[in-house]
Each structure stands twice: as structure tokens, then as C-alpha cells.
From Swiss-Prot:
Superkingdom as given in the UniProt entry: Bacteria
Species: Caldicellulosiruptor saccharolyticus (strain ATCC 43494 / DSM 8903 / Tp8T 6331)
One GO MF term: glutaminyl-tRNA synthase (glutamine-hydrolyzing) activity
GO BP terms, alphabetized: glutaminyl-tRNAGln biosynthesis via transamidation; regulation of translational fidelity; translation
Protein name (database record): Aspartyl/glutamyl-tRNA(Asn/Gln) amidotransferase subunit C
EC numbers, comma separated: 6.3.5.-
Similarity comment: family membership: Belongs to the GatC family.
InterPro entries: Asp/Glu-ADT_sf_sub_c, GatC
Length: 94
């Protein structure tokens, strides 16, 4: 059972500020989610292999293929700022 304190604790961890209505709503919704997840414990999983993925696919790669690119002029035409060779972007790191 999820309590109001549980919701407030998780909200604090996530640095969220919730209203009273949101706390009540989240308490009910998270309680319903936990209740549903607990129903999975009642399932008969005898003979079913535990898995980490739904499909048995691991490290599926595509082959590298050389394909034609857009002309540089076309790409730069759509850029808000460029120097005829590269797209200019605002500096974000000092």
C-alpha cells in the first residue's frame, strides 16, 4: 500500500513540488500500479525461462553502407547561421 508519506518522499527525491490534490491523486494512482504489479506474483511461471528482453535479439547491427548525402549548400541554406562550411551554434560551455 502506497501512503501519502511515500508519495511525498519520492516527490522530494525527484525534486517535485506537488499540490495537495496531486499528492492524493498520485497516492491512489501509484497504489493501483503497485496492486496491479503484485498480481503478477500470482501468475504461474512454472517452466518459463527468466528473460531480460522480450525478443532474443542482442547487438543487432546493420551493415555500413555508403549513401549519398545532401549537398552542403542545401543543408547550410536551412541553417540560421553558418560560415559557408559549417553550421554555427551558440556557445553553451564557458
Amino acid at each position: 500500500m502506497i501512503t501519502r508519506n511515500d508519495v511525498e518522499y519520492v516527490a522530494n527525491l525527484a525534486r517535485l513540488t506537488l499540490t495537495e490534490e496531486e499528492i492524493e491523486k498520485m497516492t491512489k494512482e501509484l497504489g493501483a500500479i503497485i496492486e496491479f504489479a503484485n498480481k503478477l506474483s500470482d501468475l504461474d511461471t512454472e517452466g518459463i525461462e527468466p528473460t531480460a528482453h522480450v525478443l532474443n535479439l542482442y547487438n543487432v547491427f546493420r551493415s555500413d553502407e555508403v549513401k549519398p548525402s545532401y549537398p552542403r549548400e542545401e543543408i547550410l541554406k536551412n541553417a540560421p547561421s553558418h560560415d559557408d562550411v559549417c553550421i554555427k551554434v551558440p556557445k553553451i560551455v564557458e
